[in-house]
Every structure is written in C-alpha cells, then in structure tokens.
UniProtKB/Swiss-Prot annotation:
Superkingdom per UniProt: Bacteria
Name of the molecule in the record: Phosphoribosylformylglycinamidine cyclo-ligase
GO biological process: 'de novo' IMP biosynthetic process; adenine biosynthetic process
Keyword Cytoplasm annotated: yes
Source lineage: Bacteria, Bacillati, Bacillota, Bacilli, Lactobacillales
Reactions performed catalytically: 2-formamido-N(1)-(5-O-phospho-beta-D-ribosyl)acetamidine + ATP = 5-amino-1-(5-phospho-beta-D-ribosyl)imidazole + ADP + phosphate + H(+)
CDD domains linked to this entry: PurM (cd02196)
GO molecular function: ATP binding; phosphoribosylamine-glycine ligase activity; phosphoribosylformylglycinamidine cyclo-ligase activity
Name of the coding gene: purM
Amino acid sequence: MSKNAYAQSGVDVEAGYEVVERIKKHVARTERAGVMGGLGGFGGMFDLSKTGVKEPVLISGTDGVGTKLMLAIKYDKHDTIGQDCVAMCVNDIIAAGAEPLYFLDYVATGKNEPAKLEQVVAGVAEGCVQSGVALIGGETAEMPGMYGEDDYDLAGFAVGVAEKSQIIDGSKVAEGDVLLGLASSGIHSNGYSLVRRVFADYTGEEVLPELEGQKLKDVLLEPTRIYVKAALPLIKEELVNGIAHITGGGFIENVPRMFSDDLAAEIDESKVPVLPIFKALEKYGEIKHEEMFEIFNMGIGLMFAVKPENVERVKELLDEPVYEIGRIVKKDGASVVIK
C-alpha cells in the first residue's frame, strides 16, 4: 500500500499537524494557575492545590451547541461558535456553585480545514478567557464518510471546584426567596431546530423590523453569554440559595431544577426583559406565547433564588441591570407559574 494511503482514504495528517500549530497561540491565552504541562500529552493535568479550596468537590459538565452549528456553517462564520460551547458547559457548573477550572474540546469534521478549525478553537479560547478556565486538552477528528466535507460537530467538557460547604444543590431555596435574573445575550444555544425552521427561507442578510437594525444572521449567531465572573462573587459570599441556567426547555424545565418538589416559582412576565429576537420568532413562527417560555430563555439567561435580605447586596455586587422577576412559593399545581 502506498505511503499516502491514509490521505487516499480522506484523512489529511498534514492538515491535522497544521491545526495544532495554528491553535497553540490561542490555547496559550487561557493559561491559569494550576495548569501542568502543555499541548501534546495524552492527558491534561491540573494541580488542584493551587485553587486554595479547603474541602474541594469537583463538578463537571459537558455540552454542545446543537444545530446552531448549522447556521455557523450556512453563514460561514466560525469564530464565535466555540464561545457558545464553553458557555453551555461553564454556565451549567456555575449553577452548582463551582468555579470552572479547565476545559477540553472535541471537534469532529468531514474534512480538516486548518483555517476554519483555527477560528473554531479561537472562539473556544475566547470563551475560556471570559470564564477564567484553562484549555488543557482537546481532540480534532477527521472523519470522512461520517460527516460532509463542510460539516463539523463541536462538544466541550468543563471541570470546576466548589467548597463542599458552598455547593448549590437546591436544598437551601425556601418559600419567600426572591428570583433575580441576569439578561441573556440572545437565543444562546438551544431551540435552534425551531429557529432554523422559522427562518428557513431567509438568507440571513435581512434586517427585520423587530431586530432594531441588526442583520438576522448576526442576531442568530450572537454568542451565548458567560455568567461565571458575575456569579462567582455571589457564590463566594454565600448570597444565593439557588441558580438556574436557562437553556433547553426554557423557564418551564430549568427553573424547577434549582428547588425541591414542594416549591414553585411564580414569575411576573412583565418584569422579564424579552429580547426582540423572541418577539420575531413568536410572530414569524406563529408560536403560541406560552410555548415560548417552554423553549427559550426569553431574555433571562441565569436566575438566582435569593433571600429578601440579600437582594440589595446581590444588586450591589452585580455591575449590571438585575431583574426582580418573581419569587418562590409553596407548590400548588405547576412548578412554574407565569403571570
């Protein structure tokens, strides 16, 4: 068999080497205390003692970005989808009270295109910088026959640490707690199968009246907001009883994940800062209004359950608008009641 047999099978080893060289500078941006070793080892290493946590509990999360990737491919814009991937992982573990420490990514593609994959990893690195996590490992798999030449998939894995006494597991959320929300940056990274159906006949260049001058494609690919730096000070001061990351399933599925079965969340819809894109989706997709809250974040990406006496301190620490959108009540039917 000839020496280029692997290339004849559709796998370009040299392109793989080029990707590694291209991404080194991006990975270097994510360096933080605790990282041991560099790229190229069989496993990434992290020295947990550097965190200063006395009773460490490791908390991990994994996620992808769903079919938002198909829009990145359609619009040939690959430099922010990596940030989405990081956000989906680190926002989940911050909801458990963890400080994210390190991240690993996995990219699978039909054809290794170094310039495009560099953009993807650059986005991952940017997400890591925003989260304060180190990108300590990853895998790029060229899989001809599994994926089309222009296609790729992306997944991420985040590990964080929490003081055992500061774990947020829902057990402290109580009747009377106030629900505070932080704004989302857009759709984030869920519901895109529906989004793509609604806008299937659009080029992405359109400026819809609802979108306040922005092109549709820019709004649809707006990166998922990362909440780590906003939430960590609140966790360290033990100011929040519960945290909900509003992702797939919207308010209805995600808010109840932060409290026990005997409680419910009462949401004042008038206090939710609904973003223009959600109004457009509801209109052009002819989606029932109540269903929107079952699918999308509607403008709130992270929610806290806070004792009334801690509300002002939380607002003081958060250097941004904080939306007081509801409260925790005794359950009498549904787990989330939107009024």
